[in-house]
Structure formats: structure tokens, C-alpha cells
Regions:
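Short, charged phosphate-coordinating catalytic segments
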Residues: 1-12, 103-104
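Basic, alpha-helical nucleic-acid-contacting "clamp/cap" segments
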Residues: 9-56, 73, 77, 129, ...
Length: 137
């Protein structure tokens, strides 16, 4: 929710996570083709807003505001009992089911702590490869 304009690269289809609980969480996250238009529309709805994701009034989304105002009501409407973290778990599962390389999955979700030394030192993926992977789900 803390995506500032300078950390979002819509033309290249990714955003930079620059604040995380762990060093491994700092990464480039691909934006799937399916949702790119939503990111663009949200951004264009308030070009002067500092943050990509914002309230209708152009204010920064706090997690609790987002969860209570958007996520929870949507889950209730759909009859689904899930948290935002469940979405992360589902993403990992869908990527694995799609046959995506485990190292790419770890890069996307920031699990580099679970990487082997070889994966950390010798494997590098450009953002196009990460976008291609996320587009398979």
C-alpha cells in the first residue's frame, strides 16, 4: 500500500518494494497484464497523489482503511473468508501449479532467504521473465 509514484514503473510492468520487514522482501514485483489497466486507472484517477493506491479522496491508504473499506467487504460479498496474506499464499501455489521455476517464485514473493547460495549468487532474472511468469496464472 506504500507504493509511491517513483517506485511504480507501469510501462515496464513492475513496482519496487523498498520497505519490508526483511531485507529479502526488498524486490521488484511484476504486474500481470490482467491487472495492469487497473493500476493505470487508479494512478490516472489522481495524478497529483503521492501514492499509487489511494482513497477516493486522494489520501494515502492505511492498511486498516484498505482492509476494512475494500478487502473485507469484497471477501464478504464473494462469500470468501480470506486475508490479504492468503492471497500471497494463493499466488505462490498458482505459480507452482503453472510450472514456474522455484527460484523465480522466490524472487517474485521475496523469499530469497529460502534460496540456496547458488540461487542467490548465480541466478539473475530480468523483469520481463518475472512478468512472463506472473502472466501464467
Amino acid at each position: 500500500l506504500d507504493l509511491k509514484e517513483e517506485n511504480v514503473h507501469l510501462n515496464e510492468q513492475y513496482f519496487d518494494v523498498i520497505c519490508s520487514k526483511t531485507e529479502n522482501g526488498i524486490r521488484k514485483v511484476p504486474i500481470a497484464d490482467k491487472v495492469l489497466s487497473y493500476y493505470k486507472a487508479w494512478y490516472e484517477s489522481c495524478p497529483e497523489c503521492e501514492y499509487l493506491l489511494h482513497t477516493e479522496a486522494g489520501k494515502h491508504f492505511e492498511y486498516r482503511n484498505y482492509y476494512d473499506s475494500y478487502f473485507k467487504p469484497l471477501m464478504e460479498q464473494l462469500g470468501i473468508n480470506r486475508t490479504p496474506h492468503c492471497c500471497r499464499h494463493t499466488c505462490i501455489s498458482l505459480l507452482a501449479e503453472a510450472g514456474i521455476n522455484q527460484t523465480i517464485i522466490k524472487k517474485i514473493v521475496g523469499h530469497s532467504g529460502a534460496m540456496t547460495l547458488t540461487e542467490k549468487v548465480y541466478t539473475h532474472f530480468d523483469i520481463k521473465e518475472l512478468v512472463d511468469a506472473i502472466n501464467k496464472i
